[in-house]
Amino acid sequence: MKVSLPAFEKARVLVVGDVMLDRYWVGPTGRISPEAPVPVVKINQVEDRPGGAANVALNIATLGGQVQLAGLVGQDDTAVALTLGVQTLGVEPQWLSIADKPTITKLRVLSRNQQLIRLDFEEAFDKADSVRLLKQSEALLDSVDVVVLSDYAKGAIDQPRDFIALARSKGVMVLVDPKGSDFGRYHGASLITPNMSEFEAVVGTVTSEADLLEKARGLLKEHHFDAILVTRSEKGMTLVTANAPELHIPTVAREVYDVTGAGDTVISALATSLAAGADLPQACAIANTAAGVVVGKLGTSTVSRIELIEALALHHGESGFGVVSEDQLAYALEQAKLRGERVVMTNGCFDILHAGHVSYLKQAKALGDRLIVAVNDDASVKRLKGEGRPVNQVDRRMAVLAGLASVDWVVPFSEDTPQRIIARLLPDLLVKGGDYKIEDIAGGAEVIAAGGQVQVLGFEDGISTTAIIQNIMANQ
């Protein structure tokens, strides 16, 4: 599957659920305690990170989505720390403060990149607290496209069926990261994302792939879900819907350091992608890739858009050079700019590649680090040059160009001018051969407006594709 990132900045998501503070005490261990056979950790670093539903919200914000966050907290210093943690990424929380309950805190002691112990500070919230939170959140439904219910069984999401029904009636998708053995609580949700343990806690032991699909479809029918995405660790993910074949997405192989928050990353990437307009298979592939990134980090972490672009390019074959699609080139171009490389772009028909072309492309490449050549497809060449052209089909023209040492990427376009593709890619330098005026070069205005430059290069006199064709015909 070729995966394209949607415009995450268009995503509008509401996250409701169990928020918590993940606190880390970190330090070296050099000896065993004389009091008990346990290591002594000399703490030299303390770090607080938003966790649970708050981590989901931060993941969405890090990807570039617009996110609102609602959850239950205590009236304590931990709530203040949690608030500051989410506000650093522009997330303004809609807390419901409960006077007689602490803000949930999970304290982890780490040494040498290993977790030694976890201490939980929490008390379950009352059902009435959940009712008030969901009622408060109803007012936010008109301003979002997707709702995430992040359920850690701490009391924030107790009986959400009415809330789900209201959201669906407003055309808002509801995604649920479930907990517990009763998925009926989430009746009518658009999508639920159980891991394999959570799935089997509800349906029983899964004995085969066919058994998994049968049990998943049973849940779809029983609880009126649109889809179930089962996350399966090293086996990747399986998406099951009522009206389409199942989709198996293999895991993104990499070394796993910490699975903390991986489920948060999956549902946040799903929600952001769907809210930005991606279809469900694309959103699942993006979520799978994001999870592969986050398990390579220690502790509760987020995934940035750049990290996601790099991972997609690596695992979906979209970072290479040579002949590429426009979407593939967009990924590769972002990577190049991230590396600080200067990107040059030119365009043309290049019907019969000749010495003049080679010289021109060599000059263009010398002006930067990477060279893009956009090539007119066959239909546009015929419109521009007339009957009998092109002599060479676009695939052959691009293959020859890609073989030149000076050319990094070759991409086709179908319009008569390359203005649209240039405006999308926005190279650092746009070059054109011949006697053009800069203001007449297609795409030049867009490049200049974005801070780039436009330059005209000379062609070698006496050499042209038309002249070569005429010479061949004259000698027949």
Swiss-Prot record:
The keyword Cell inner membrane does not apply. Keywords: ATP-binding, Carbohydrate metabolism, Kinase, Multifunctional enzyme, Nucleotide-binding, Nucleotidyltransferase, Transferase. InterPro entries: Bifunc_HldE, Carboh/pur_kinase_PfkB_CS, Cyt_trans-like, PfkB_dom, RfaE_dom_I, RfaE_dom_II, Ribokinase-like, Rossmann-like_a/b/a_fold. The keyword Transferase applies. Residues 345-476 are annotated as: Cytidylyltransferase. One of its GO terms (cellular component) is cytosol. Pfam families: CTP_transf_like (PF01467), PfkB (PF00294). GO terms for biological process: ADP-L-glycero-beta-D-manno-heptose biosynthetic process. Residues 1-319 are annotated as: Ribokinase. It comes from the Bacteria. SUPFAM superfamilies: Nucleotidylyl transferase, Ribokinase-like. Pathway: Nucleotide-sugar biosynthesis; ADP-L-glycero-beta-D-manno-heptose biosynthesis; ADP-L-glycero-beta-D-manno-heptose from D-glycero-beta-D-manno-heptose 7-phosphate: step 1/4; Nucleotide-sugar biosynthesis; ADP-L-glycero-beta-D-manno-heptose biosynthesis; ADP-L-glycero-beta-D-manno-heptose from D-glycero-beta-D-manno-heptose 7-phosphate: step 3/4. Its EC number is 2.7.1.167, 2.7.7.70. ATP binds at residues 195-198. It catalyses: D-glycero-beta-D-manno-heptose 7-phosphate + ATP = D-glycero-beta-D-manno-heptose 1,7-bisphosphate + ADP + H(+); D-glycero-beta-D-manno-heptose 1-phosphate + ATP + H(+) = ADP-D-glycero-beta-D-manno-heptose + diphosphate. The active site is at 264. One of its GO terms (molecular function) is heptose 7-phosphate kinase activity. Homodimer. In the N-terminal section; belongs to the carbohydrate kinase PfkB family. Catalyzes the ADP transfer from ATP to D-glycero-beta-D-manno-heptose 1-phosphate, yielding ADP-D-glycero-beta-D-manno-heptose. HAMAP family: HldE. This is Bifunctional protein HldE. It comes from Shewanella putrefaciens (strain CN-32 / ATCC BAA-453). The gene is hldE.
